[in-house]
Regions:
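Single-stranded nucleic acid-binding surfaces, predominantly the OB-fold ssDNA-binding core
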Residues: 1-109
Length: 109
């Protein structure tokens, strides 16, 4: 069996690391334009949340920031959230490796 995902996109915000139950945790949000145009002739963008832990979380928060392009290698993991005595199921992307690819574009002066 294989559970592997590779994403390349632009970080939508700076990354902050916080202490979780089992170590350090960071949530990253990637903006990834689709490879095809919609009915209006423009490209839609998907926003994908990812989670990094411990050293990956620390290194990513120190080296990458909002607007930077990164590559993520990871896996998809199911999760269960209990809200008001009701279970909700979802998926999350777990970052196993984050690679800095390029900086955000410089604003024109």
């Amino acid at each position: 069996m294989l559970n592997q995902i590779i994403l390349v996109g632009r970080l939508t915000r700076d990354i902050s690391v916080h202490k979780g139950e089992n170590g350090k945790v960071a949530t990253l949000s990637l903006a990834i334009p689709r490879s095809f145009k919609n009915s209006e002739g423009s490209y839609d963008t998907d926003f994908i949340d990812c989670v990094a832990f411990d050293a990956v979380a620390e290194n990513t928060s120190e080296l990458c920031g909002k607007g930077d392009v990164v590559g993520i290698k990871g896996r998809v993991q199911s999760k269960t959230i209990e809200k008001e005595d009701k279970k909700e199921y979802g998926l999350e992307i777990i970052c196993e490796k984050v690679t800095f690819l390029s900086s955000k574009p410089k604003e024109e002066e």
